[in-house]
């Protein structure tokens, strides 16, 4: 970097010397005249021409730089497109490999599914055959194996559901396979389209590369031509500048010689000046003739004649000195102007040298770039050849894979047709097995209905027998009480006869005092006050305890713990130690015959019992009564006691009832209990209104509603209803409700006595569709 700063000084000296020589060598006619601005016209024209060429060169250089940048950008775009196409090709190859792997995995899965499906079908067929054999064997033992059959049915239903699920899964898998085959077809079509697009893009790329090569060659030729033209132009300019330099040097040498001569002449004139000062006065007088003298001086100067007169010679010398001063001043101005021009020429020369150096460096860089682009062009051609070969190989591979996939697809379609045939066979087998299962279910339902009917008939017989036994027990107790009463009457009459025999005036004595003091049976074991108006005391009745209403609910069941004042919380015993629970009055039972006016023949009929193993005759069928229910134990009394019924307790539902309803019910119960009267209108109203309605509380009754027997000190109620019509052996009793048809909700238990009125809720929930309840036996 130090050389450019060191070279300008000697170079400038040489340029100045050459300019001086050029100026000295110029003739006087070639020397430029002065212009109004102080510059010669030739220099101005040269500077304008040089400026014009400089502007043209600058414009051409800018055009070349812009053109080169556009070419580089275009090459970059082409490289980016090539890289994008290569990446797309790699992605497509990866997708194709993934699809091939998925297809192979799918083939393995389909083969495994076919094998597993065949095994499952065989196992299911075996299991179904085993279940059919088991069901055929178990038909003979349906009475003891109904629950087992239900379990088997549940298992078969689960198996059928599993089979349905398998069928759904198989159908889904078939649909998925079809979708996958469609997707593969679409992917194959897309791959073909992509291959076609690749071919088109390759052709376009080859055409673009050819165009780029042609453009490159054209640019190289144009660059060479332009470089040659510029070199020729610069050579001409340099030759012209050298010529100008020589002329300037010649003019400079001539000017230096003239300056030296004039300096010598000035020195001589300065020597003559003091001599001429003395003659100044004489010169003032001859000022008028200056013009003529000047002409004469010039003529004499040219001719070289010597002046004889010293005054005239001095004047001429003075005039010549003035002219020399003027010419010296003009020469100095020209000298300064030439020096300025020389400096400008040196500057332009330096600029030209620098520009030449820059052009040389640019030429070297362009040559290197040309070499680089040629190498890249060769590389791209090689890559194009390799890519074309690679694409051809890929096309062949893809075509082979497509043929293989088409073969696989044909095989899969054949397999799918086979699987569909197997599925159709399996569906037919499933339909047959379903029909068999339905037939078996119908047979089971029939057997269950048959055995339920038998159980219901047996329960009804047991219930009727139990009612007959209870009525017989009541009749026995009534007869025993009547016997005791008759014995008491006999003892009283015997005592009266004895007293009459002893003292006939003893009739005036009151029967009460006599009985209390002298009767062996007094005081009465029942603690009854004797009647003074009656001659014969009446026996104890069965209505000493307060009456409690016991309507029957269709669904059975009762409440939990009752109130502490309930007389049914414990068994009431009389003074003899006999239980008094039989004295409770049922509205559906016949009243006791203790105080009735029936004849002894009817009593004998009531005492008649059929032999064991036979039923009651229709004419002598005793009135049927419902089972009693005690609130503490919540159990049935009688033969139905050990049986367990699956009943939904209504205690939880009853807890949500308002307290006002329960208080009104309790008031109604207390009112009815204090009347000692069985109200038969309540069951009729309950039957009329239905089991879902709550009866309103009854008003207190002031007097007896039924005929009474006024023979004893206590009123004896007659039968509230006429006797029931005679029933058959399997006829429904008054408190019995027949079971509903199966299927449906579970059967209602047998009617039971209950101390509470019916509830305002349904006894059972609505049955669910397809739900078969368990039998209640």
Curated annotation (Swiss-Prot):
Subcellular location: Membrane
InterPro entries associated with the record: cTAGE_MIA/OTOR
Basic and acidic residues bias (residue ranges): 572-591, 649-672
Transmembrane segments: 39-59
Record keyword DNA-binding present: no
GO biological process, one term: vesicle cargo loading
Chief localization: membrane
Family in the record: Belongs to the cTAGE family.
Role, per record: Tumor-associated antigen.
Protein's name according to its UniProt entry: cTAGE family member 4
Organism the protein comes from: Homo sapiens
This protein's encoding gene: CTAGE4
